Amino acid sequence: MLLIAILEQKVTGKQARQSWRQLLWKYGEPAPGPAPEGMRVFPDADIWRRVPSWEWHAAGVGPQRADTVMRAVKVAASLERTLALGRGGPTVERALRSIPGVGVWTSAETTQRAHGDPDSPSVGDYHLPALVGWALIGKPVDDDGMLELLEPWRGHRQRIMRLIENSGFAKPRFGPRLTIEDHRGR
């Protein structure tokens, strides 16, 4: 889950999913047993360690994110032991954030997915603070404003954010959408 969160850093969700799909298709193995066609198994840390830099580039993953993944897979065994600690918390966050390139947002995204932490809000997300602000008070807010709005739900802040995201509510749009640039051919 950490690897997926790293791939999602500073890019659109569409770009991250394309990168993940390409890497998983190339380095994952077919799922065992009866499984849908094309389903792949997440590669282990040893396989990720052997992915050459040009494959990351070909998948649209820049050098900073690829380097962060490489640092993470070097300590994969110790990170996997954090799963026994339960639903996140300071010890898990410190372990994740000890890896250069893993910050507050990546740590929160990882503890949400891998640890099932219901209270790790994604601080630093490009869209979420404004979405939460528009949904709860009718205007955009920054990270601090989002945390203030979510405070009554401490213990479940991440769940509230996901409920808002999945409710169908959409914040107002004021301009054109971001054009996704493809730098892989350069």
PLM regions with names:
Residues M1-R186:
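HhH-family (HhH-GPD) DNA N-glycosylase catalytic core used in base-excision repair
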